[in-house]
Structure formats: structure tokens, C-alpha cells
Amino acid sequence: MVSLKLQKRLAASILKCGKGRVWIDPNEIADVAMANSRDNVRRLIATGFIMRKPVVVHSRSRAREHNAAKRLGRHRGAGNRLGTREARLPSKILWIRRIRVLRRLLKKYREAKKIDKHSYRELYLKAKGNVFKNKRTLIEYIVKSKTEKLREKLIQDQAQARRNKNKSIKDRRAAKSAAKEIVSSN
């Protein structure tokens, strides 16, 4: 058997592919063996004695199917897991995700003037202290605290109005009694 290493290398260079993809016609080995220059190899390529093999298809259809099933929750059971829960998804990463969501929301609310800077700081520190499990609980807390503040303000206003009313009544009574004393002394 004649060595066709040189011809294969030259053909690979000309065809711009790897040596593994170069096909040499087994019936024309004698002619191919005689080709010892690039021009001769080009001639053999033109005649069809040397060809470039097509790329071997490595289908991803099975992998795609498997990934689609995984998205539906298949192949995720205890038997398919390697590594502890912490190794698979560290609690620190979960914390970072959660705190970033909460802080982004607080910042947005502060910029939209939904909360003032004092409540922002208070809620920021509460979020840092792991008070809020998720975004929804934080929003609920904000709404609840706002309604509570409004209620307290309303109660304070009513109490102040009551105090003012009582004071005015007291003043009127005092003025009346003072007027009576003046009349009785005359």
C-alpha cells in the first residue's frame, strides 16, 4: 500500500479542511500517488479523484428534547442530582437575588415619592435584616404602614379639632362668666 500522507496534507490545505475530511478514490490510488505538487493535487480535485467529505452531522435533537423535558421538571429527581442543595444553588446567590429585587423596588418607590427618605432607610434596614420574604410582602408592608400612618394622622387631627373646640367653648364660658361678674359688680 502506497503512503498518501503528502497528497492528503496538500489536499487538506487546498480544500481548507482537516486531513480527516479528505477522501481519496480507492480505485485511483496509483494516479494519486504520482501527484507530488499542489498543481497536480488541484488537477486530481478537479477530476474528482480527491474530494472533501461533508461535515458529519452531530444532531442536537435528542439534547433539545431532553432540555425541553427538564424545563417541565423531568429528570430532576433525587437520583439525578449530584452535589448538595447548597452546591447546586448557593443560599448566598438566592439572598443576593432577593435583596437586589427588594432594594431596586425601594429605590423606585423613593424616586417616585411613594415613600419618603426616612421610611426608605427604615425599610432598607428591615430588608437587610431579612424581614421581607419577597417583593410582595414588602409592598404589602408599605401599603399597610402608609394606611396606618394616614389613620394615625386622621385620629390626631380629630383629637386636635376636639381640643380646639373644647378650648373655644372654655374661652367663651370664661368670657361669659367674666362679663357676668362685671355686670354683677356694677
Curated annotation (Swiss-Prot):
Keywords: Calmodulin-binding, Ribonucleoprotein, Ribosomal protein
Lineage: Eukaryota, Amoebozoa, Evosea, Eumycetozoa, Dictyostelia
Region of interest (Disordered), residue spans: 158-186
Pfam families membership: Ribosomal_L19e, Ribosomal_L19e_C
Function: Ribosomal protein that binds calmodulin.
Any GO MF annotation of the entry: RNA binding
HAMAP family assigned: Ribosomal_eL19
InterPro entries (alphabetical): 60S_ribosomal_eL19_sf, Ribosomal_eL19, Ribosomal_eL19_CS, Ribosomal_eL19_dom, Ribosomal_eL19_dom1, Ribosomal_eL19_euk
GO cellular component terms attached to this protein's record: cytosolic large ribosomal subunit; large ribosomal subunit; lipid droplet
A single BP term in Gene Ontology: translation
SMART domains from the UniProt entry: Ribosomal_L19e
Family matches, as Gene3D superfamilies: 1.10.1200.240, 1.10.1650.10
Family: Belongs to the eukaryotic ribosomal protein eL19 family.
Name under which the protein is recorded: Large ribosomal subunit protein eL19
